[in-house]
Amino acid sequence: MTALNHTPLNAAHRALNARMVDFGGWDMPVNYGSQIEEHEAVRTDAGMFDVSHMCVVDFTGSRVRAFFEHALANNVGKLKTPGKALYSCLLNPQGGVIDDLIVYYFTEDFFRVVVNAGTAEKDIAWFNQLNEQGGYGLTIAPRRDFAIVAVQGPNAREKVWATVPAARAATSELKPFNAAQVAGTPFGDLTVARTGYTGEDGFEVIVPAVHVVALWNALQQNGVRPCGLGARDTLRLEAGMNLYGQDMDETVSPLDAGLAWTVDLSAPREFVGRPALERDGTRAAFVGLILQKENGKAGGVLRAHQKVVTPHGEGEITSGTFSPSMQESIAFARVPAAVQLGDIVHVQIRDKQLPARVVKLPFVRNGKVLAA
């Protein structure tokens, strides 16, 4: 049996009596007692997540922009001011999703990317291959000397500023999907990004791994609640945010995973996967589902891999959960393209087909329920 990877916060999680699970080869906290209370803390106040299993990768060289114009489905031409961030898919030549990631522009010869934990080695090998094939001459450096703490919720930014006063001046004017570098804090030099995976405001803080325990403890002392992967999943599902490996993978086009908005076909760029996307187009709809109640009760919970029966053919749930914010069972589903918003479809749950309504994603943003 292979030993699990540990983040630098592993001992801190155990000291808080976290329930630990194997998450893609990493020993990670699923909750610290109450997943529901952790979810509510993020929706109403501030919670924090250890996301140090994700990998920071630095790209340096004079042709780094040209490299990403070729490598990514979204267009780094949109990145014009230092610290600006972009969400994108990394595609294979068949148009399937190798990973989804965030890329940060700092200078014309320095970009930073944050990739998913389970795909990091595969991503880096692919980046190295593209770099070599294209003769870009970049230095590609995985930065396992960094950790990442995501602080999320309506009070998250204020609590980060209370913990790291030097960050206030650098980040108080940051718009969403922008980052600032904050040097000389008690926790080392930080990259503070106004990004997240919960549908709430907040920061993701890239911090030297040697300082992350001190930052974590200081945030907790300032009233930020530790949250595990369980709450992270219900929050991101409510927020309509995809999970790699579940909602899309190398066999799925971003156009069939609700990610067409991340694919920029407007510019004449020859990016990897573009010919396949243009050839195949959109073949399925990616929608939200809300399980319908009968006599005030739902007959089950929507879960991944359940079959969805529609008049236009069958589909499948990719992610599902019980929503603490809505008190409803919700899901993402990939269904035939002819399925429309407002339609009633049927989900196979054990030996029953239960009705579910098709809705537009997201379900919840900034504490407000959007899907009715």
UniProtKB/Swiss-Prot annotation:
Q: What does this protein do?
A: The glycine cleavage system catalyzes the degradation of glycine.
Give the family per the record. Belongs to the GcvT family.
GO annotations of cellular component type: cytosol; glycine cleavage complex
Q: List the catalysed reactions.
A: N(6)-[(R)-S(8)-aminomethyldihydrolipoyl]-L-lysyl-[protein] + (6S)-5,6,7,8-tetrahydrofolate = N(6)-[(R)-dihydrolipoyl]-L-lysyl-[protein] + (6R)-5,10-methylene-5,6,7,8-tetrahydrofolate + NH4(+)
* Listed GO biological process terms: glycine decarboxylation via glycine cleavage system
Q: Which organism is it from?
A: Burkholderia vietnamiensis (strain G4 / LMG 22486)
Instruction: Keyword check for Iron, yes or no.
Output: no
UniProt EC number: 2.1.2.10
Task: For this UniProt record, give its keywords in alphabetical order, as a comma-separated list.
Answer: Aminotransferase, Transferase
Check the record and name the NCBIfam families matching this protein: gcvT, PRK00389.1
Q: Which GO terms describe its molecular function?
A: aminomethyltransferase activity; transaminase activity
Summary of subunit composition and partner proteins: The glycine cleavage system is composed of four proteins: P, T, L and H.
Which Pfam families does the record associate with it?
Answer: GCV_T, GCV_T_C
Quote the protein name from its UniProt record: Aminomethyltransferase
Q: Does the keyword Transmembrane helix apply?
A: no
The cross-references to InterPro entries, in alphabetical order and at most eight, read: GCS_T (IPR006223), GCS_T_bac (IPR022903), GCST_C (IPR013977), GCV_T_N (IPR006222), GcvT/YgfZ/DmdA (IPR028896), GcvT/YgfZ_C (IPR029043), TrmE/GcvT_dom1 (IPR027266)
